[in-house]
Amino acid sequence: MWRLRAVLGAAAICAIAMPLACVAAPPPPALPAETPAEFHPLETGFDYSERHVDIPMRDGVKLHAIIMIPQGAAHAPILLTRTPYNAEDLSAHRHSSHMVAMLDGYDNASDIESEDGYIRVIEDVRGKYGSQGAYIMNRPWKGPLNPTEIDHATDTYDTIDWLVHHLPQSNGRVGLLGISYDGFTTLMGLINPHPALRAAVPMNPMVDGWMGDDWFHRGAFRQINLSYIYEQEATRTNDAKWWETHYDDYDMYLAVGSAGALARSHGMEQLGFYQKLVAHPAYDSFWQDQAVDRKLAAEPLRVPTLLVHSLWDQEDIYGDIAVYKAIKPKDTDNSRVFLAMGPWHHGGEIRDGSALGQVRWGSDTALWFRQHVLRPFLDHFLKDDAPPLGLAPVTAFETGTNEWRRLPA
């Protein structure tokens, strides 16, 4: 009996003590986070300010853009690039308090853009990186290949409309420029353009993907582009990376046997654009109906345009010359369509243009182009009270003599 009482007493004590212990037990110690809930970087001494915005389109989709505004800007023109290559990256090639360093890289004539006081805007196209919506490779304009009411022309229009109404530092004039795919989006902005679009500089643009730009070169499929298509279409942010089986691509092509086999080994049947390439190996209506030069030939000439051609462009050797032939006849007084041709590879006009491989030109041809062709073109059409334009219809670098020539249309 005594033992029973002892057990019952101990149980009662435990029953009372355990809840008290649970309530009274202090929480384990924790170190406070050193990362603030929201960090506000200081930009003291920066020669620009930066905004990250999401611009609404007419269908409700929002497109992500980076806006860089020089300190003290007033009545400044806007230079816009629309890209599938990540606006965040193209606006931050380096991390710096100086705008010229931030923009020093692909798609940016950083010396002209920063020295001349332009507001720089870089926007992710629909469906890529920070932008909402569906991505379509070289999205066609509204028509047989695009039954929707949305294309690059409408997105460009809506973007420009938002910019001129939300950037009080601007003079309301916008220029489009871009290289390669971004040259393609620049040309698309010429279709039913916004009234504030006053100049366009398509550099090495994709124009006809079968005739001579990117995918086919007059019917010869460029299997080297499979890796580009894979990374561009597999994910919104290019997270899926093309993997190699050989150190040398040539050995890989020999080993795999065909472009189709190489694509299948990487699962590319899942990608919409690859399916279109397989379905349209010939120059059928699929390619003809999205050839940008054909479209622009049927459009009124509304926007002054400077086409930039690289004489040794390994990717888009066809497009800018084709567009020049299509729209130049409309420029009867030689005041709105210009062509510059330099001794560069694809995109070489924004880099050091002193040489091509081992061939040296005796000067930085790209710098000369930017200072003597690009700058006066942009100044004339975008700046307030700009000086008269003295450009020849064609400005071309002549190899051998290594001199720039001013040529008639």
Language-model regions: role of each:
Residues 178-188:
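Glycine-rich nucleophile elbow surrounding the catalytic serine of serine-hydrolase chemistry
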